[in-house]
Amino acid sequence: MAKVLVLLKVLPEDINIDLEELKEKIRKALPEGYEIKGYDIEPIAFGLKALRLYIFMPEETEGGTEPLENTVMNVEGVSQVEVEAVHRIT
């Protein structure tokens, strides 16, 4: 079965949130079969930075990326989640 690579942009609640710690909280919250394969940090404005996560998830997930988005939104310190791209990986 193929996997799906999702590029997820995560905005923190506050500019003082440590994005490395936030990434680890998200990693721990992900369900089985989901895996952070990489990340980068994107400056937004006025000191605010976004965490861009590259996440592998199962292809046959009911609801598409919605369960992933909901899981990440429920992590403490996350203000907003946006799917930037979705790619099927064979």
UniProtKB/Swiss-Prot annotation:
Assigned keywords, A-Z: Elongation factor, Protein biosynthesis
InterPro entries documented for this protein: eEF-1beta-like_sf (IPR036219), EF1B_bsu/dsu_GNE (IPR014038), Transl_elong_EF1B/ribsomal_bS6 (IPR014717), Transl_elong_EF1B_B_arc (IPR004542)
GO molecular function: translation elongation factor activity
Keyword Protein biosynthesis included in the entry's annotation: yes
Highest rank taxon of the organism: Archaea
SUPFAM superfamilies assigned: eEF-1beta-like
Name of a matching Pfam family: EF1_GNE
NCBIfam families in alphabetical order: aEF-1_beta (TIGR00489), PRK00435.1 (NF001670)
Summary of the function given for this chain in its UniProt record: Promotes the exchange of GDP for GTP in EF-1-alpha/GDP, thus allowing the regeneration of EF-1-alpha/GTP that could then be used to form the ternary complex EF-1-alpha/GTP/AAtRNA.
HAMAP family noted in UniProt: EF1_beta
Similarity section: Belongs to the EF-1-beta/EF-1-delta family.
Name under which the protein is recorded: Elongation factor 1-beta
